[in-house]
């Protein structure tokens, strides 16, 4: 039987849709690891989650809302809006809610950036800033961070007529460092009025240095300052993705015009309201970090490791470059002992590891494993 002749497909069928210019050049976000070979329940110190878990009030509120999962949520998040406004003494109409802070940051990029514009950020800044900017075909200007700290003169010196956004992580991730009150005001005052200063304050609640400034007082009267916050860290709601921004009214209006209409679920909104109401859980979470962060810093320093002073719920640790003692080898060693930490080579810090402040038994196990590593 004669087989049919198979001809080449027409040219049209070989053409496929391609992403717009620049998309495939973007390096995707790299999350912290969650698995360690040979351990069913490893100690995860790689993602800066709340090590105490979640507020019982948040859990109860989530479960109570579960019978409404067939309904669309309130698009304006009115109850959550009122709760956040009351908790932080803010004007409710100046709040924008998102599917985690990530969405809020992307909204800012979409609102302000055109091809050829640029953003300014520190060289160790959160990679989502650059991802969002490049998706808008904007340029990214990364400024040096001497001593693991943002340089206000360097940031101001990178601003030009095409700069639309300046991103500051306050405190920084993965560094844990921060701009002092004087530095923050100098940066804000030095920016042209058409440039938006964005303070990403995912870790702000953990800061206890008297020179730390959360920026809310400044933002109340500023027309170009946006502050973002999250329920993922202190409040332990990372799985539910609830973030928000406090903006000048005209910026809030622009962001609301393009955000997804139902971007925070009923269960997430109710859990966030419950979390805000649980002052005891918040206090306990802060007390835990503020007790064990200095302990970790001291113990790691005692092993001959350099620890960057941190105002977050993690520490950044620098390892020697000597063979057998590097950060990459330490990360492998810790994983072999059931401890997952975060390598930060993708932030330009190949000699460092970022380590979340864990429970007491986690912290002691970490120090014991690293003591063995450094002495082998």
Which ranges hold each PLM region?
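PLP-dependent aminotransferase class I/II
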Residues: 224-308
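N-terminal "arm"/small-domain region of PLP-dependent enzymes with the aminotransferase-like
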Residues: 2-71
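PLP-dependent enzyme catalytic core of the Aspartate aminotransferase-like
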Residues: 2-5, 182, 325, 329, ...
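PLP-dependent aminotransferase-like
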Residues: 111-168
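Phosphate-binding glycine-rich loop
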Residues: 73, 78-118
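Conserved PLP-binding catalytic core of the aspartate aminotransferase-like
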Residues: 290, 301-337, 353
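Short acidic capping loops at alpha-helix termini that bridge into adjacent secondary structure
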Residues: 91-95, 115-118, 162, 194, ...
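Active-site pre-lysine segment of PLP-dependent enzymes
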Residues: 134, 150-161, 174-197, 201-234
């Amino acid at each position: 039987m004669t087989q049919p002749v198979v001809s080449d497909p027409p040219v049209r069928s070989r053409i496929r849709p391609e992403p717009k210019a620049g998309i495939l050049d973007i390096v995707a976000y790299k999350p912290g690891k969650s698995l360690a070979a040979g351990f069913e329940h490893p100690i995860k110190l790689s993602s800066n989650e709340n090590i105490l878990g979640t507020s019982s009030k948040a859990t109860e509120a989530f479960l109570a809302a579960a019978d409404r999962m067939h309904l669309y949520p309130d698009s304006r998040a009115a109850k959550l809006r009122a709760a956040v406004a009351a908790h932080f003494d803010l004007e409710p109409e100046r709040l924008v809610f998102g599917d985690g802070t990530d969405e809020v940051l992307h909204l800012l990029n979409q609102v302000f950036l055109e091809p050829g514009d640029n953003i300014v950020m520190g060289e160790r800044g959160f990679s989502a800033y650059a991802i969002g900017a490049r998706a808008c075909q904007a340029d990214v200007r990364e400024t040096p961070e001497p001593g693991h700290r943002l340089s206000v003169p360097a940031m101001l010196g990178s601003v030009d007529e095409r700069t639309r956004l300046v991103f500051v992580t306050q405190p920084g991730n993965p560094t844990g460092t921060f701009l002092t009150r004087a530095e923050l005001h100098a940066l804000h005052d030095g920016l042209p009025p058409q440039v938006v200063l964005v303070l990403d304050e995912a870790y702000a609640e953990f800061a206890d240095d008297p020179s730390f400034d959360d920026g809310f007082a400044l933002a109340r009267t500023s027309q170009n300052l946006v502050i973002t916050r999250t329920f993922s860290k202190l409040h332990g709601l990372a799985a539910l993705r609830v973030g928000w921004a406090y903006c000048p009214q005209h910026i809030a209006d622009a962001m609301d015009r393009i955000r997804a209409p139902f971007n925070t679920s009923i269960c997430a909104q109710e859990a966030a309201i419950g979390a805000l109401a649980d002052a005891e859980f918040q206090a306990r979470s802060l007390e835990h970090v503020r007790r064990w962060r200095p302990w970790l810093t001291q113990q790691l320093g005692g092993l001959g490791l350099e620890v960057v002073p941190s105002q977050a719920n993690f520490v950044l640790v620098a390892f020697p470059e000597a063979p057998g003692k590097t950060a990459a080898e330490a990360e492998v060693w810790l994983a072999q002992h059931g401890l997952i930490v975060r390598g930060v080579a993708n932030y330009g810090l190949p000699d460092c590891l970022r380590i979340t402040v864990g429970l007491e038994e986690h912290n002691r196990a970490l120090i014991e494993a690293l003591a063995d590593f450094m002495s082998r």
